[in-house]
Swiss-Prot record:
Metabolic or biological pathway: Amino-acid degradation
Protein name, as recorded: Glutarate 2-hydroxylase
Disulfide partners: none
Gene3D superfamilies tied to this protein: Clavaminate synthase-like
Function: Acts as an alpha-ketoglutarate-dependent dioxygenase catalyzing hydroxylation of glutarate (GA) to L-2-hydroxyglutarate (L2HG). Functions in a L-lysine degradation pathway that proceeds via cadaverine, glutarate and L-2-hydroxyglutarate. Is extremely specific for glutarate, but it can use both 2-oxoglutarate and 2-oxoadipate (2OA) as a cosubstrate for L2HG formation.
Assembly and interaction partners: Homotetramer.
GO molecular function: ferrous iron binding; glutarate dioxygenase activity; oxidoreductase activity, acting on paired donors, with incorporation or reduction of molecular oxygen, with 2-oxoglutarate as one donor, and the other dehydrogenated
Entry EC number(s): 1.14.11.64
GO biological process: L-lysine catabolic process
Cross-referenced InterPro entries: GlaH, TauD-like_sf
Cofactor list: Fe(2+)
């Protein structure tokens, strides 16, 4: 079966076959597609963008699109249509991407360039206040005293959407694993809204569209609260979410009880998908109908995982996609 048959709603013509990479449904879920880039493609990309350090991409934002163009050219123009169609397709909307040969922390700069190329073939990554850049790198170790669950290794980080506490459209999230040592557990956890057993009940609840207050801890470096509902709709009236349990501030008993029930329903879903992500690989998902989290790690004094994230908006005809944000 051609994996392209998974994509139900085309926004631009698909190539007959991918060039320079393969595409197939993942073992974990037919909604999550695996793109694997050939070593030759990756090496050619690394060589072609060697003239620009990551700092150049930080300072000159148009270069982020240029490295995307280079990667698409190496794939003979077949990559951008696949990325766009997949990220916008309600039936899929998620990818696990592996560039063969980029699998060591010493190649971290090339990993950032490669992920940036993919992200900027579909849109643009937003400013990340935590890092002051269009991406953020952070480390998880065995002990943690931070002010959110992002770096806490020995507990599950609950399912959530990104961008809930900023006034920016967050259509996609990209999560790259740069390095890990002495690591057991810690798989990515995913849930597609259309697979969540109780989605319809919560979506139809009177509180689903009530504007709520969202605030972030100091580490996020976001000073102002934002206000929005937990649920919204896409252009076809299907549910979308902007939700994270840590940062929503219920105004009263009614809201608090409903939010607790919503959290318990998400965490108790039997449709959660556990996805191992190798060093150098990354997830690229639609942030509005996929929720993501992380399973707990097994304690180890030498535990270390370094991650990078990008999150942003899809720069393709918006009326075809998302309204209400």
């Amino acid at each position: 079966m051609n994996a392209f048959t998974q994509i139900d709603e085309l926004v631009m013509p698909l190539p007959l076959e991918p060039q320079g990479y393969t595409i197939a449904p993942s073992k974990q879920s037919p909604r999550l597609l695996e793109l694997t880039f050939a070593r030759e493609t990756v090496e050619a990309f690394v060589q072609a963008v060697a003239q620009w350090p990551v700092q150049a991409l930080e300072y000159k934002s148009f270069l982020r699109f240029r490295v995307g163009e280079i990667l698409d050219e190496l794939c003979q123009g077949t990559l951008r249509p696949v990325l766009l169609n997949t990220i916008l397709d309600r039936a899929t909307g998620g990818m696990l991407i592996t560039p063969i040969g980029l699998d060591d922390v010493s190649q971290a700069e090339d990993m950032v360039k490669f992920t940036t190329a993919c992200a900027h073939l579909i849109g643009r990554s937003n400013y990340d206040a935590m890092s002051g850049q269009f991406y953020a790198r952070f480390v998880v170790v065995n002990s943690d005293n931070s002010d959110s669950y992002l770096r806490q290794p020995h507990r599950v980080m609950e399912l959530h959407n990104d961008g809930t506490f900023v006034n920016q459209i967050t259509d996609y999230v990209l999560m790259l694993k740069i390095d890990e040592k002495n690591m057991e557990g810690g798989n990515s956890l995913l849930l597609h809204l259309d697979d969540w057993e109780q989605c319809e009940a919560f979506f139809r609840h009177p509180l689903a569209r009530r504007e709520m207050r969202w605030t972030a801890p100091p580490s996020k470096k976001v000073a102002e609260d934002v206000f929005h509902s937990v649920f919204d709709t896409d252009a076809e009236g299907r549910p979308t979410m902007r939700y994270i349990d840590q940062f929503v501030q219920p105004e009263n008993y009614e809201e608090g009880i409903w939010l607790n029930a919503l959290s318990e329903s998400l965490e108790g879903s039997g449709k959660k998908v556990s996805v191992p992500v190798g060093v150098g690989s990354f997830l690229l998902i639609n942030n509005l109908f996929w929720l993501h989290g992380r399973d707990r790690f097994t304690p180890h004094e030498g535990l270390r995982r370094e991650l990078m994230r990008q999150r942003g908006y899809v720069a393709f005809p918006k009326p075809l996609y998302q309204r209400g944000q």
